[in-house]
Amino acid sequence: MINLSSYQGAIYEKLTSLGYNVYDEVPEEAKFPYVVIGDIEFQEAQWHFEDVLDISINLLIWSIWEGKKEVNDISSNIINSFADLEDVKAGEQSLYKFSFGNSSIKRLDGVYNGSLTLDFSVK
């Protein structure tokens, strides 16, 4: 049985261990910079004969620093921290494929936003 909340929890723990404020829902008093665990998408994996699920979790990085440096640095730290697949395991489920999907850094209304997509497969 797949438990999406356990993966979100493991990602939350990983991000907070890096020293970032991490939210599912951003409180009004949130201080920049912070990371939001955004949309979660999942589907049955194609081309597999066993019970495999592909999961994508979007991370949103928000900063009011002038320029992209802070968002770039946070994005780099997150990418480097997820190099070890074992850190994202949750319960009995086996994580066997991990990568970063579409990602971007943009300026929106004076605030810099980085968007990182974590793609992984579990069975």
State the predicted function of each range.
Residues 36:
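Conserved beta-strand in the GNAT
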Residues 33:
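A solvent-exposed, acidic/Ser-Thr-rich amphipathic alpha-helical stretch
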Residues 1-29, 39-123:
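Charged, amphipathic alpha-helical segments and their flanking helix caps
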